Design a protein with these regions (language model features):
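Metal-dependent active-site segment of extracytoplasmic phospho-/sulfohydrolases and closely related
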Residues: 30, 48, 211-252
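Structural recognition of the beta-strand scaffold that forms the well-ordered cores
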Residues: 28-32, 39, 59-62, 75-77, ...
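A long, amphipathic alpha-helix that forms part
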Residues: 162-174, 191-232, 374
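Bacterial Sec-dependent N-terminal signal peptides
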Residues: 1-26
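Active-site neighborhoods of enzymes that stabilize oxyanions during catalysis
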Residues: 265-376
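Loop/turn elements at helix/coil->beta-strand transitions in domains of secreted/extracellular proteins
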Residues: 24-29, 54-58, 126-132, 178-184, ...
C-alpha cells in the first residue's frame, strides 16, 4: 500500500511538472519579407534561411488570389480569402461607397469600412494577450474599433528603416515580462521593390535578398542572446513570389471596350472591370478569346481561386498568363505578381523555428492556414476563418 501511495504521488508530481512545462510561456514573432520567392534560397546565397531550414520548418506558401501584397498580408492575419475579408486587390472600386481603395491614398487605405474579418492582433488582444506590430499592412487601421497595443503608421514620415524595425522587435522582446508582447509582427518591403525593378533574377534583386539575409543573421544572433531565447517561435514568411515580365508583354484591352459600358478598370494582374448596369455581357463578349489571358464573368471565376462572391470584385475579370500584364502601355522588363497561385513563380517563403516546431521539410501550403497556426502557438481561440490547423499540424511538435 505504501508503494502504491508513493507511485500515486510520483504520478501526480510528474503530471504537475508536465503541465508546468507545457504551460511555459512561448512568444511568437512573425516577419514578412515582401515579394520573397520561395526558391530565392535555392538561387542565392542565403545562410540564414538555410540555417532555419536545418533547424526548423522548410516550406513555402501558396498565396491567395490575386497574389498581391495587401490582399495576402491581410489573409495571413485573418485566415480569410481576399473575397471574404474584403481587400480584394491592391486597388479596387467599391460600388457601395462609390470610392476606390488605393494603396496610394492613405485616407482610403486606413478606412476600416474595407477591412473585414478578425485580424490576429484583435483576436489576441480580446483574449488578454499583448501585441506589437511594425508596419504589417492593415495594422494601422482601426478594425472593429481596435488597434494592436503597439503599432506604427506606415504613411507617417520619417518611416522606420528596415533595420529600425528589426531593432524594435528585439527591444519589445527585451521588455520586462509584464510589458512584453506575446505576439510581435514585422513587415519589410524588400526584396519586392528590387524584384519589380530588376526582375527575380536581376543582380540587384540577388544583392537585396543577400542583404536581407545578413540583416536577419544579425537579428537572430541578438534574439538568441536574450534570456527568453528558447521560448520564442520565429516565423519568417512572405506574401507572394515574383515572376519575370519581358519587354512588350502587355495585353491592350481598352480599344475593344466602349466608354458607355464602363464605370472603371482597376489593376493589371488581374484587371477588374466594373461595368454599367446591363453591360456585363457586352464587355465579356468583346474580350472573350483575347490572347495571353482568360476572361471571366464575376460569377464564373474558377472555384479553386475563391474569388468573385465579393461585390468589390469587377463584373468582368481579365486574368493574364504568367509574365503578362493587362494594360495599353508597353510593359517594361522586370518583375510582377498577382498571377494565379497555380504558377509556382508566385509561391512565397515559409520558414519557422522554435520550441513548438519540428525539424521538417513540408510541402507548400495555402496561406489561409497561417492565422490558425499563430492562434495555436499563442494558445488562443480562433475566429471563423478559411484555414485549418489540421492541414499543417505535422510541422508542430
Amino acid at each position: 500500500q505504501e508503494i502504491m501511495k508513493k507511485l500515486f504521488l510520483t504520478t501526480i508530481l510528474l503530471a504537475f511538472v508536465a503541465i508546468s512545462i507545457s504551460a511555459k510561456k512561448h512568444y511568437t514573432v512573425v516577419l514578412s519579407l515582401d515579394g520573397y520567392r520561395w526558391d530565392y534560397t535555392q538561387w542565392y546565397n542565403t545562410p540564414f534561411m538555410d540555417m532555419m531550414a536545418e533547424k526548423g520548418v522548410e516550406s513555402g506558401l501558396i498565396p491567395s488570389y490575386p497574389s498581391k501584397t495587401f490582399p495576402n498580408h491581410y489573409t495571413l492575419v485573418t485566415g480569410l480569402y481576399p473575397d471574404h475579408h474584403g481587400i480584394v486587390a491592391n486597388n479596387f472600386y467599391d460600388v457601395r461607397t462609390g470610392a476606390s481603395f488605393s494603396l496610394g491614398n492613405a485616407e482610403q487605405k486606413t478606412n476600416p469600412v474595407y477591412y473585414g474579418g478578425d485580424p490576429i492582433w484583435n483576436t489576441a488582444k480580446r483574449q488578454e494577450l499583448k501585441t506589437a506590430v511594425f508596419y504589417w499592412p492593415g495594422s494601422d487601421v482601426c478594425v472593429c474599433g481596435s488597434y494592436p497595443d503597439t503599432y506604427y503608421i506606415y504613411d507617417k514620415q520619417p518611416r522606420l528603416t528596415m533595420q529600425q524595425r528589426l531593432d524594435g522587435i528585439i527591444e519589445q522582446l527585451a521588455l520586462p515580462e509584464k510589458k512584453r508582447p506575446d505576439l510581435i509582427m514585422g513587415y519589410l518591403e524588400e526584396p519586392d521593390h528590387n524584384g519589380h525593378d530588376f526582375g527575380p533574377q536581376g543582380k540587384q534583386t540577388r544583392a537585396m535578398v543577400q542583404k536581407v539575409d545578413s540583416m536577419l543573421t544579425n537579428f537572430y544572433k541578438r534574439m538568441q542572446a536574450l534570456p527568453i531565447a528558447n521560448d520564442i517561435n520565429l516565423i519568417i514568411l512572405s506574401d507572394h513570389g515574383m515572376a519575370w515580365v519581358a519587354k512588350g508583354n502587355n495585353v491592350p484591352i481598352r480599344h475593344l471596350l466602349k466608354d458607355e459600358w464602363l464605370v472603371k478598370i482597376e489593376g493589371n494582374i488581374p484587371a477588374n472591370i466594373y461595368v454599367k448596369p446591363g453591360c456585363q455581357d457586352s464587355v465579356y463578349n468583346a474580350l472573350h478569346g483575347i490572347e495571353h489571358a482568360r476572361v471571366w464573368k464575376r460569377n464564373n471565376i474558377p472555384a479553386r481561386l475563391h474569388y468573385g462572391t465579393n461585390g468589390r470584385v469587377g463584373d468582368v475579370i481579365v486574368d493574364p498568363d504568367l509574365g503578362w500584364l493587362i494594360q495599353n502601355k508597353e510593359a517594361n522588363e522586370g518583375g510582377a505578381h498577382g498571377f494565379d497561385p497555380e504558377y509556382s513563380d508566385v509561391h512565397a517563403l515559409f520558414r519557422a523555428v522554435g520550441p513548438d516546431f519540428k525539424h521538417i521539410k513540408f510541402p507548400h501550403f495555402a496561406n489561409v492556414n497561417v492565422y490558425s497556426l499563430i492562434c495555436h502557438l499563442l494558445g488562443i481561440k480562433e475566429s471563423k476563418n478559411d484555414g485549418n490547423i489540421d492541414n499543417i499540424r505535422t510541422i508542430l511538435q
